[in-house]
Amino acid sequence: MDRIIEKLESGWWIVSHEQKLWLPYGELPHGLAANFDLVGQRALRIGEWQGEPVWLVLQHRRHDMGSVRQVIDQDAGLFQLAGRGVQLAEFYRSHKFCGYCGHPMHPSKTEWAMLCSHCRERYYPQIAPCIIVAIRREDSILLARHVRHRNGVHTVLAGFVEVGETLEQAVAREVMEESGIKVKNLRYVTSQPWPFPQSLMTAFMAEYDSGEIVIDPKELLEANWYRYDDLPLLPPPGTVARRLIEDTVAMCRAEYD
């Protein structure tokens, strides 16, 4: 699947190492390979954006290495491809040797996988399923400040799905563990690949059922009900959390305005 990049090769360039992304001038490189000193490098074609190829180059650059979060305000499709590149780069870096027999591995030529030529084991990129849920109580939405978000942003509740657990069970458990309340009338909304580091967010809306807010201090700094027209600082546009909040606000406006 990989190839040597030639002088006139063009497209979008995902240059990644250790979950970082090369962002000269704060943007994803776009254009001729020669303009970015990429001629002669090995590259994988990982997709297409606006009719042009998207290439992954496994390489560290001394300057301008940043987080994929810096391109979250790009078009959703391009952000997803950037996230794919960063996750694949980390997958290839962390799977150089077989976990069963210890022998060197090599990339598959037909799929995103690493193969062991000794014991024939096959490894795929790990994806961690997560739930994220907007909870409505009449004209209000439950928003919380997480311990890892010290910038004042309030968002909806989220968490990882545990082994042997359904998505619906994960929603009920995470909400109870983090806020102490029960929910009902769960409804699936959408999903979003989230490369921090390798999650797949499954988004839901739910209604408040019972209980008083009792936060888990290991997870949350605070949690409260906020009326739809009096909200605190929210996650940025482009995130599934922001979409859930905006969808909930739209439902409240339709009913209470």
From Swiss-Prot:
Cofactor: binding comment: Divalent metal cations. Mg(2+) or Mn(2+). Binds 1 zinc ion per subunit.
SUPFAM superfamilies from the UniProt entry: Nudix
Required co-factors: Mg(2+); Mn(2+); Zn(2+)
Residues noted as binding a divalent metal cation 3 in the record, renumbered to the chain: E174, E178, E219
Residues annotated as binding a divalent metal cation 2: E174
Residue span(s) of domain Nudix hydrolase: 125-248
A matching Pfam family: NUDIX
Organism this protein belongs to: Salmonella heidelberg (strain SL476)
Intervals of motif Nudix box: 159-180
This enzyme's EC code(s): 3.6.1.-, 3.6.1.22
Binding locations of substrate: R69, E111, Y124, Q192, P193, W194, P195, F196, P197, Q198, S199, A241
Known function: mRNA decapping enzyme that specifically removes the nicotinamide adenine dinucleotide (NAD) cap from a subset of mRNAs by hydrolyzing the diphosphate linkage to produce nicotinamide mononucleotide (NMN) and 5' monophosphate mRNA. The NAD-cap is present at the 5'-end of some mRNAs and stabilizes RNA against 5'-processing. Has preference for mRNAs with a 5'-end purine. Catalyzes the hydrolysis of a broad range of dinucleotide pyrophosphates.
Binding positions for a divalent metal cation 1 per the UniProt entry: A158, E178, E219
Protein name: NAD-capped RNA hydrolase NudC
